[in-house]
């Protein structure tokens, strides 16, 4: 029987496809070995430059991955919602973290320790398949973000950050305009104007603190259409 360190953490692990195929003793060892990290909005949960301690997942909440240039310019380039893993590349290379992980709302992280991460990579085909899928997804996201931030209009940036290639869960996103602006690199006022325009076009509907996606393909078409170069 699994130890009750955290019912959400146990349920989260049991929902992972690679976890189900492990022997019971390995499952129990993993559940006992994970650690939890909590933070409020604005907290830096994990710091750039620290040695990576494991593979992380967002149990609840929302975080942004934020890098800082040598000139001190900060850039938030990806949001990670509840239910998703992140940091697999750094865990595989066992390097210093290249970005800060900052809570955009009250958040809880789960950490699978490096020792267990290595053990699973060495022994579990299903775990390695999950890692490959995760890395492929992140590569696609990174390429889309780079292209959009360099070449696209504010409307296309917002459409991209609402797209299914960045959010794989429910199509009712519990995402505030402030959070969306942080991720897209736009002011809250600009995001508000853009969302109103998308709503008028029938691509989204807006509720308090939530954006409902009505037309995934329409958002994708908008995000990938030829656009003007974004302002620096």
List where the protein language model places each region.
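Cyclic nucleotide-binding regulatory domains
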Residues: 18, 43-105
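Polybasic "coupling" helices that flank or enter modular domains
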Residues: 104-105, 122-188
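Phosphate-/nucleic-acid-contacting segments
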Residues: 154, 162-232
């Amino acid at each position: 029987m699994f130890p009750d360190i955290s019912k959400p953490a146990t349920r989260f692990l049991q929902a992972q496809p690679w976890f189900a195929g492990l022997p019971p003793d390995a499952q129990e060892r993993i559940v006992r070995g994970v650690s939890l990290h909590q933070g409020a909005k604005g907290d830096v949960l994990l710091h750039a430059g620290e040695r990576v301690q494991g593979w992380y997942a967002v149990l609840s909440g929302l975080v942004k991955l934020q890098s800082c240039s040598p000139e001190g310019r900060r850039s938030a380039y990806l949001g990670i919602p509840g239910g998703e893993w992140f940091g697999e590349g750094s865990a595989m290379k066992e390097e210093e973290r290249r970005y800060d992980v900052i809570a955009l709302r009250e958040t809880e992280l789960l950490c699978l320790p490096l020792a267990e991460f290595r053990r699973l990579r060495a022994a579990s085909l299903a775990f390695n398949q999950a890692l490959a899928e995760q890395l492929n997804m992140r590569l696609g996201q990174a390429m889309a973000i780079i292209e959009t931030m360099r070449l696209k209009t504010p409307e296309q940036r917002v459409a991209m950050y609402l797209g299914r290639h960045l959010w794989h869960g429910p199509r009712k996103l519990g995402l505030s305009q402030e959070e969306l602006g942080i991720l897209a690199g736009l002011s809250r006022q600009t995001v508000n104007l853009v969302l109103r325009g998308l709503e008028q076009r029938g691509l989204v509907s807006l509720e308090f603190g939530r954006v409902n996606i009505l037309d995934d393909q329409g958002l994708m078409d908008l995000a990938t259409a030829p656009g003007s170069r974004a302002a620096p």
